[in-house]
Amino acid sequence: LQQNQLADESRLFIFSDAAARAEEEENVSEVRQLIKRISGFKQIEIIERHKNLGLANSIIDGVSRLVKQYGKIIVFEDDLISSPYTLQYFNNALNRYESEKRVMHIGAYMYPLHKEVETTNKGGLPETFFYRAATSWGWATWARAWKEFEPDIDKLISQFNSRKIHEFSIENNMNFWKQVKEFKAGKNNSWAIRWYASVFLKRGLTLNPSESLVNNIGHDGSGVHSGMNDIYNVVVNHKPITTFPEVIDENKIAYQAIKNFLRTRKGSLWQRLIRFAKQKLSA
């Protein structure tokens, strides 16, 4: 992030959560010492939590606070590697679509779609496109969109029917509805699935790059919310984004490519067994 174009013109707010358990306090202290040495930004403000909020509550509180103050926000978690042009992409998109009410979210991550694009469209995808689902690995939004965020899972669920569940789940190719049900059952504490559901129910759109501008390196098993998984690993695009969609509608070719990726992402039974064995060996 420090090496991004526009970093030296950006205000950086770092939200440091408190330790969830006593044995984690030393690690939190080390992280807080590290972030105090960060430089390269126009302004840096560190918000140290005195009690553990957890990822979901920390994100919701931080985003709500900053969009109220600034009207828009760019959000990174601490396990992301970004292109040097990621901030430029976010800022350009935030300015371009500020008044487009249907555009509610800007994502920086995109699945590795090369094979899917080759089979669905020989001409490839545009640099950026609109899609229905909201990604959480590097994203941005506006106060006018965030005010539509509904944290109450029961209120969200009550607005879905079987058709909407089918569309929400990318025609049952992604476990988004399972995540909703698991949140309801107390099995996860995801802010992201509630945000996507909020966007979806408002018929909102998300802007995305066809080549990912971030990669999540938190899948090595060391992060709190991580798991060994290389399915979503990408090569970060190191070129600036220069074109944005004029038509405010979901890109059908991109949707088909994403659907194909999600349907085949886990590979054959043999590939799944190998991946499972690697996870067990690394545990």
Model segments located where?
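An acidic/histidine-cluster motif and surrounding catalytic segment
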Residues: 1-75, 80-283
